């Protein structure tokens, strides 16, 4: 079980919850802090102090005083009116990640919600009930208002959920399971929707998939090196230590490990003096991707454990401060950086595909075809890879440089962080398919060279990958092969071998 403390949630924890079904609990210290902050809110209400979000309107209506008798209606109206998301629903993993992250933020004790609110989130997580949350509509400040409102709808018995693969009304799901919806009290509606948990949830899923794919990309590149009889000297440790980037040094070391014992790779001068950049510069380019992933990971870890509500309560409610922790700029920048890095991983992989299929660049059969001319082989696979690379270049345009004022210009600068995160996830999906295409072509190339001469590590990859996509002996519908290989990679195909 992962115990939320509001301070110690890790990416490994998120992976365990989202992909392995590990349950979630709450530490006793968090329970104490939640209850203390709630008492502070109730005292504010009792004393009649005017505090934003507790007894005022929202956004441009922040100067409108709300009567105590209207508090519950205020919170309900906030959720209903802000649930304006459009587009397709987020995946179950992202929906669940949003709940985990929101529960963890509320567990810090700065938001003033009742313990029942956090417990309801944990119940949904642990019973695998996934709010149906539209993916479009967030400006990334004040946080992810629209998507988080769709999450909050479920807590009050409204909206829709997915349960056991079926989409249904929240009311019918709760009735089936005997769950009582909440009636939100002072500040709780705002506390649920004012934060960066949508962009961070998408970012977490994008990062986890990107990290796995970065390792797999090295494995596939190693097979390509054998298929093209690449020059191993370029991975010599001395070259990379001379530059000094640790990530580059690490990639070179993994490439040496993967290719150890290969009789297909060559030495410089044996067949040619040097390779093209897409082979020779694997450590430099892939290493730079790892540098970017390190930056993204650091920012996600901070945001996963951040208080992003507004206002925040300090000193047992003596200080209630309106700030801007809901502004998604740090995650927006990180996601834009992830877009760039993963787009580059796709760029260099596609160039290796071109070298595998272009008869002017190798001595393999044209387009790896078993009967060139009569059969086209992998010709159009390279087209698809090029198309995905081009799409990624468009998606990698930074979302964070845009801002459109909202709420009558009260919220006059926004992050567009959720757009950046969605783009990053789409790029990762595209790059996975590019890597799948490289893998299919590399497997075919080494089969022409002779698999007996492969390195032990790459041969292990070959054997397992061939169970997914068989040898190309004649033209067939290769779309099925690409999707099968991409799904295998998504499920973790041979990522562990790169780490050994």
UniProtKB/Swiss-Prot annotation:
It catalyses: L-histidine = trans-urocanate + NH4(+). There is a cross-link at residues 141-143 (5-imidazolinone (Ala-Gly)). Its EC number is 4.3.1.3. Keywords: Cytoplasm, Histidine metabolism, Lyase. Pfam families: Lyase_aromatic (PF00221). Contains an active site 4-methylidene-imidazol-5-one (MIO), which is formed autocatalytically by cyclization and dehydration of residues Ala-Ser-Gly. GO terms for biological process: L-histidine catabolic process to glutamate and formamide; L-histidine catabolic process to glutamate and formate. This is Histidine ammonia-lyase. It comes from Shouchella clausii (strain KSM-K16).
């Amino acid at each position: 079980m992962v115990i939320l403390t509001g301070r110690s949630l890790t990416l490994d924890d998120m992976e365990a919850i989202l992909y392995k079904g590990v349950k979630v609990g709450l530490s006793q210290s968090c329970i104490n802090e939640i209850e203390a902050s709630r008492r502070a809110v109730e005292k504010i209400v009792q004393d009649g102090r005017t505090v934003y979000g507790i007894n005022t309107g929202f956004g441009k209506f922040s100067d409108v005083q709300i009567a105590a008798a209207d508090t519950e209606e205020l919170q309900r109206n906030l959720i209903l009116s802000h649930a304006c998301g459009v587009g397709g629903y987020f995946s179950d993993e992202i929906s669940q990640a949003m709940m985990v992250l929101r529960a963890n933020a509320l567990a810090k004790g700065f938001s003033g919600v009742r313990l029942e609110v956090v417990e309801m989130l944990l119940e949904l997580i642990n019973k695998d009930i996934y709010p149906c949350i539209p993916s479009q509509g967030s400006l990334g400040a004040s946080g992810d208002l629209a998507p988080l409102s769709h999450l909050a709808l479920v807590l009050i018995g409204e909206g829709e959920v997915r349960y056991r693969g079926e989409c249904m009304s929240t009311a019918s799901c709760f009735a089936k399971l005997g769950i009582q919806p909440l009636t939100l009290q002072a500040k709780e509606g705002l506390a649920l929707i004012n934060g960066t948990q949508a962009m961070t949830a998408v970012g977490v899923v994008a990062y986890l998939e990107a990290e796995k794919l970065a390792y797999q990309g090295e494995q596939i590149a190693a097979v390509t090196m054998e298929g093209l009889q690449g020059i191993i000297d370029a991975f010599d440790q001395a070259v990379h230590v001379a530059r000094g980037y640790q990530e580059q040094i690490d990639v070179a070391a993994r490439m040496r490990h993967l290719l150890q014992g290969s009789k297909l790779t060559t030495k410089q001068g044996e067949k040619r003096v040097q390779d093209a950049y897409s082979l020779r510069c694997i450590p430099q380019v892939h290493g730079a991707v790892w540098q970017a992933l390190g930056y993204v990971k650091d920012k996600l870890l901070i945001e996963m454990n951040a208080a992003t509500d507004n206002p925040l309560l300090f000193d047992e409610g003596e200080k209630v401060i309106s700030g801007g922790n809901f502004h998604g700029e740090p995650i927006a920048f990180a996601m834009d950086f992830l877009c760039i890095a993963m787009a580059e991983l796709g760029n260099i992989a596609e160039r290796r595909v071109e070298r595998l299929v272009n008869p002017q660049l190798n001595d393999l059969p044209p387009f790896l075809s078993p009967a060139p001319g009569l059969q086209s082989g992998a010709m159009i696979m390279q087209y698809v890879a090029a198309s995905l690379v081009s799409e990624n270049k468009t998606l990698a345009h930074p979302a964070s440089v845009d801002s459109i004022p909202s709420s009558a210009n009260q919220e006059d600068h926004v992050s567009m962080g959720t757009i950046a995160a969605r783009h990053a996830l789409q790029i990762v999906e595209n790059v996975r398919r590019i890597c799948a295409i490289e893998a299919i072509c590399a497997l075919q190339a080494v089969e022409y060279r002779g698999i007996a001469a492969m390195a032990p590590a790459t041969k292990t990859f070959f054997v397992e990958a061939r169970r997914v996509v068989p040898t190309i002996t004649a033209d067939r519908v290769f779309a099925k092969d690409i999707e099968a290989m991409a799904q295998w990679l998504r499920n973790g195909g041979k990522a562990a071998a790169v780490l050994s």
